[in-house]
Amino acid sequence: MINTKLLFVLTRFCCENSSSCIQVSMVLFLIKNTLLYLGCCSSKSRTAAIVGAAFSGVTMATASLTGLFHVPVISYASTSRLLSDRSRFQYFYRTVPSDNLQAQAITSLLHEFRWHFVIVLASDNEYGRSGVTALKQTIQNYTTRVQICVVVDELFSRKGSQYEMTRIFRKIQQFPRAKVIILYAEFPDAVYFFKEAKMASLRNYVFIATDSWVGSTEVVQGSSDIFQAIIGLRPPIVSMPKFDDYFLKTLKENNSRNPWASECNKSLICSDKSVERCQSEVHHDGYVAYILDAVFSVAHALHAMLSCDEKVCAKKWRDVDIRDLSQFIQNVSFVGYSQENIFFNEEGTTKGRYDVYYLDKESSKYIKVGSWSQTALSLNLSRISQPGPDFPFPASICSNYCRKGTSVLFVFTVLRLSLLSGQVKAYSRRALRAI
């Protein structure tokens, strides 16, 4: 058991804005000067660690700054593989797997469904660029007889021009046999993409959703004609009944200082008398368990660093070197709220696995249909109830597969220049290649 009095948590919200998060980080370091001015603490008051952020770009900016002060950053959702670079982010850790692992999972799905002719679109930011790079490297290195061909590979931004989106959609339409789109986008960019795709009259594609937007029906609201199916990957969602009970209790208290209660009342039209309506509608984000894992990683590290038992600590925070905390975080090992064994590798990342989800059009809900780990992909497609000629998913190949016992005949022409006569002669050659 760890000493539960170790942590004082100061919460700040900076959304996806890197500049705002840098300002918040600076405020954390300036708090010490404010407390000193008020005369309520010693000069040894210091920020121990920062939990967050969610967006990879924001986390990179924050970790770059706080690393100068030897303050660890533990993210619960940032997956960019760039954050694994210890020469840049020496004090960074995360409780979710990196894009490298997600790329392996996506590639496994492509081969499982024999999708060998695909389109890759990504946010033009750290999350998208990093993810696509990892995916293309994984596809290239994947050992298989049939290679995956990426026919469209484009970055987009919701702050970009309309011309760029039009160009991308026209390029997609040049490959009618490519029916699978891997959308490696952060949530706001995914919302933007589907709105633009609807205006461009994109129809009946299969989308592979990455962990940033899978699970959200808001992304595809009003865009059901664009996709035939959506299948996606995300770290496992863990049931948190104690957290749900605490959240509901907080709503019932109707604390005017609680911004979350206020927002819930606005969105669900709740009041003191009808707050029970929130019980069935409000649910915690799937990353809550990973946030708690990040917080407890710091707690376990401080517990060991300060030589604590359940009641007291042998050492004082003011007497230890803050630079040592990172190494204690590196060495933690415990069973987390995510039901995973939490420990960090040399890149500051935990091991990971993914659940596979499918968006059921009839119910507008995501259904878990499988799981992926580094050892195996397991699918249960019987849970998908969507009849049709392409059940469960359409083909996405450059040509039709041959019948059993036949092979593809490739015919190509070779131009040969005769140096003596100066004439160009055409020779037809044939090559047989089995599928």
List PLM regions with ranges:
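Short beta-strand-centered segments that line the small-molecule binding cleft or hinge
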Residues: 59-78
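Short, conserved non-catalytic motifs in the polymerase core
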Residues: 90-96, 276
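Flexible loop/hinge segments that line or gate small-molecule binding clefts
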Residues: 77-91
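Acidic helix-start/capping segments at beta-turn-to-alpha-helix junctions
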Residues: 6-18, 316
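Aromatic (phenylalanine/tyrosine) cluster motif
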Residues: 8, 13, 29, 410-412
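Extracellular ectodomain signature
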Residues: 1, 18, 23, 31-57, ...
